[in-house]
Structure formats: C-alpha cells, structure tokens
Amino acid sequence: MTEQAEDALPIRFTDAAASKVKTLLEEEENDALKLRVYVTGGGCSGFQYGFTFDEKINEGDYTVEKQGVQLVVDPMSLQYLVGGEVDYTSGLEGSRFFVKNPNATTTCGCGASFSV
C-alpha cells in the first residue's frame, strides 16, 4: 500500500502496532486472531477505547491489514475513530496499544478515555 493510499484510510494501523500484534499471534500460535479496537461509553471523559483479540469479522466491520495481521473496527466505533491511528508503545510507563484520535476534544491523563 502506498503512503498516499494509507493516508486515505479511515483509520491507520502503525508498523509498531502491527509488529506487536504479529508477535502476540505467534506466541498464541493462532493466526486467526485479529486486533479489534472499539469505543464504549465510560471513563472519566465520556468514551473509552478498548482492545481485544477476536477471531471473527462481523458484518459491517472495517478491516486494515498490515504485515499479514488485521485490525478490525465495528461501524459504530469507526465513526469516533475516523482519521485516527492505532499505535503501540513500550517504555517506562509500560507497554500498550493506544489510539491517536484527532476527533477527541479532551482526553484523560492516561489517554484511555476521551470526549468528542
């Protein structure tokens, strides 16, 4: 996929996130798993992000493939994530997947919840 084509996607899946998913799937020995990102009500800012591994792609789900692994987003969550990026970081504060969301008007200190 070209950089221009990747920029046109509703949500981006970084190399760091895809690489970590690939490593985790190899450890689990289950290539059918996909990283699902979703938005639910809650958290200190109104909405919160969630991540889980899922074997299914449901009707209407949006998928992005990178490095042979898939990111899956349900249509309801996608409307809050358009233009965003799913990334992965590892540092002194620990390791985690996170969302860079240009639609968030406020976020909490830990970055796990947001409002629009």
UniProtKB/Swiss-Prot annotation:
Record text on cofactor binding: Binds 1 iron-sulfur cluster per subunit.
Alphabetical keyword list: Iron, Iron-sulfur, Metal-binding
Keyword Metal-binding recorded: yes
GO annotation terms (biological process): iron-sulfur cluster assembly
Binding site for iron-sulfur cluster: C44, C108, C110
Family: Belongs to the HesB/IscA family.
HAMAP family for this protein: Fe_S_insert_ErpA
Protein name, per record: Iron-sulfur cluster insertion protein ErpA
